[in-house]
Curated annotation (Swiss-Prot):
The gene coding this protein: hemL2
Keyword Flavoprotein: no
EC number(s) reported in the record: 5.4.3.8
Protein name (record): Glutamate-1-semialdehyde 2,1-aminomutase 2
Keyword Zinc assigned: no
Metabolic or biological pathway: Porphyrin-containing compound metabolism; protoporphyrin-IX biosynthesis; 5-aminolevulinate from L-glutamyl-tRNA(Glu): step 2/2
Taxonomy, superkingdom: Bacteria
Broad class of enzyme this protein falls into: isomerase
Length: 429
């Protein structure tokens, strides 16, 4: 049995200092019934907690660390920038370098604005969509999480799903009434919403792969249908690629599925592990953003040189060949997890998109939030705790996916499959 004495003591102290002892709810490990692990360091595919336990990491800071922890090139870039100054409140050339890479690789982006978080990116994109169209309502999907902006914290997933909250107290009814929610992968409901409110719907915002109800890919024709419906009704299509951006493919989720939105939100990978976000799209739309247009958005640390340098060094290391290797590794892990579950007769459903994998303990195909909620949460919690004992660090929520990095080796994946085999053998009915 692993010892967690130092993590337990640190969490006891933290609960007097921060709400729930953490700075983001899912980190409290509540849904898996254990004390949170306090991490000390990471290198490559491994993390080490303050009690000295080693884990193969599939959290990767919730997705950003696509090259694993403390990537040499990213670390050297950060050192070089920090020695010259960490922030100036003025433009720097590294902003141009990262912007060029983003524009080159993301089909929908002709102009991009850097911000500080994924939430900031989605909030800014909504304001832009409303300002550009002159409309008020937005359409989002039940269980899709787009950050904690008021307009988007309606029937959201992620930590909200983990905590069992349908919304959040503090979101005014006047804000909520302008957010239309329908089931993910349900194109007919989208069409019906446009029949009812089409003249006032500014945009549809969607994760190309729903990553905050587990991992739920789009059904064939769903994204294409959204593109068609929005174009027919004069609304903008926004892809929230904070999670899928540069994660599922070289050209992001929109390249992977061949559907080009009007606006795209980015985060996570483009900051290489530092706080970052971005939104971009067609030039005619983005030029409405201040100072070139009237739609205001600003940020003290937007385009921070540390985040820009980490993001640039992260992206330049990603090539089309990187994603071929991601696919191979992810297929290997997916097959191994499926084989272990089948061997022990454990109800399961595994979804995957590129290097994102979601395992649900249910017999039901998971194509939307209602299906995701059919998972056996008690079994997941027990499985999670056993995987920790086996030295595997997974996201502490049924409603989050696993992430792979370029640092994960075949040996890591084989060890993870072996750990899952042990865990499932102990937990089978």
């Amino acid at each position: 049995m692993k010892k967690f004495d130092k993590s337990i003591a640190a969490f006891e102290e933290a609960q007097d200092l921060m709400p729930g002892g953490v700075n983001s709810p899912v980190r409290a490990f509540k849904s898996v019934g254990m004390n949170p692990l306090f991490m000390e360091r990471g290198k490559g595919s491994k993390v080490y907690d303050i009690d000295g336990n080693e884990y193969i990491d599939y959290v990767l800071s919730w997705g950003p660390l696509i090259h694993g922890h403390a990537n040499d090139r990213v670390v050297e870039a950060l050192k070089a920038v920090a020695e010259r100054g960490t922030s100036f409140g003025a433009p720097t050339e590294i902003e141009n370098k990262l912007a060029k890479l983003v524009i080159e690789r993301v089909p929908s982006i002709e102009i991009v604005r850097m911000v500080n978080s994924g939430t900031e990116a989605t909030m800014s994109a909504l304001r832009l969509a409303r300002g550009y169209t002159g409309r008020n309502k937005i359409l989002k999907f039940i269980g899709c999480y787009h950050g904690h902006g008021d307009s988007l914290l309606i029937k959201a997933g992620s930590g909200v799903a983990t905590l069992g909250l349908p919304d959040s107290p503090g979101v005014p009814e006047g804000v909520a009434k302008n957010t239309i929610t329908v089931a993910y992968n349900d194109l007919e409901s989208v069409k019906y919403a446009f029949e009812q409110f089409g003249d006032d719907i500014a945009c549809v915002i969607v994760e190309p792969v729903a990553g905050n109800m587990g991992v739920v890919p789009p059904q064939p024709g769903f994204l294409e249908g959204l593109r068609e419906v929005t174009e027919q009704n004069g609304a903008l299509l926004i892809f929230d690629e904070v999670m899928t951006g540069f994660r599922v493919a070289y050209n992001c989720g929109q390249g992977y599925y061949g559907v080009t939105p009007d606006l795209t939100c980015l985060g996570k990978v483009i900051g290489g592990g530092l706080p970052v976000g971005a939104y971009g799209g067609k030039a005619e739309i983005m030029r409405q953003v201040a100072p070139s247009g009237p739609i205001y958005q600003a940020g003290t640390l937007s385009g921070n040189p540390l985040a820009m340098a980490a993001g640039y060094e992260t992206l330049v290391q990603l090539t089309p060949e990187s994603y071929v290797e991601f696919e191979r590794k992810a297929e290997m892990l997916e097959a191994g997890l499926r084989k272990a579950a089948e061997k022990h007769g454990i109800p399961h459903h595994i979804n995957r998109a590129g290097s994102m994998i979601g395992i649900f303990f249910t017999d039901e195909p998971v194509i939307n939030y209602d299906a995701a909620k059919s998972s056996n949460l008690e079994f997941f919690a027990a499985y999670y705790r056993e995987m920790v004992e086996q030295g595997v660090f997974l996201p502490p929520s049924q409603f989050e996916g696993l992430f792979l990095s370029t640092a994960h080796s075949d040996a890591d994946i084989e060890a993870t499959i072996a750990a899952a085999e042990i865990a499932m053998s102990k937990l089978k009915a």
